[in-house]
Amino acid sequence: MTYSMTVAGLQRELPICKITDDLYIGAFICFGDAELTVACARDLLKLVENEEYDYLFTAEAKSIPLIHEMARQSGAKKYFIARKGPKAYMPDPIHVEDRSITTAGVQKLYLGRDDADMIRGKRIVLMDDVISTGGSLHAMEELVKLAGGIVVDRIAVLAEGDAQQRKDIQYLAPLPVFNADGTVK
């Protein structure tokens, strides 16, 4: 089963994937789709064109191509990625915990002290590919706050399910959640 949708002016078929017995989601994947990545980055930048911000910030992994393309198109020299684990090159990393609809159990997000120091006092736009329960977005926001940054906006390609009702995010397109038979909940 697939769900047909248009985002950033492009038509795509999203495979419908089981999360639980009564919850299925449309899998939005930019990996390997250069055309979609470029178009979504362009339109995400339009959402914040009047926003004063210093840096873009996301969590690995599916949003990495998007944030890179957003930086390329906007001329930004630096962006930040919260990692799912500490890396040897991260001096004195800080971290927060997160629960995501697509990740089993608790996941931690890490940021090296060097990046945290660059974020301190800066205006940050959080970006994610899909906002669903808001767990990943909340964890990113907590990590930015822990680093001393100021979140000025939250953007995503898609708002899934109840996230469409949120007033604190901007997004390019809505994405419903599905029943086992592929019908919209």
Give the ranges of each region predicted by the language model:
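Short, ordered loop/turn segments at secondary-structure junctions
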Residues: A61, K84-P86, A159-E160
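Short, glycine/charge-rich flexible loops or terminal/linker lids adjacent to PRPP-binding catalytic cores
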Residues: K77-I124
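Short glycine-rich phosphate-binding loop at a beta-alpha junction
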Residues: Y53-E60
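Conserved G/P- and acidic residue-centered "switch" motifs that form tight phosphate/ATP-binding loops
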Residues: D129, G134
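PRPP-dependent phosphoribosyltransferase catalytic core
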Residues: T2-S4, H138-K185
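Conserved acidic residues
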Residues: D54, K122, V152
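Short Gly/Thr/Asp-enriched flexible loops that form oxyanion-binding sites at enzyme active sites
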Residues: P65-S74, E141
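Active-site-facing substrate-recognition patch
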Residues: M1-Y53
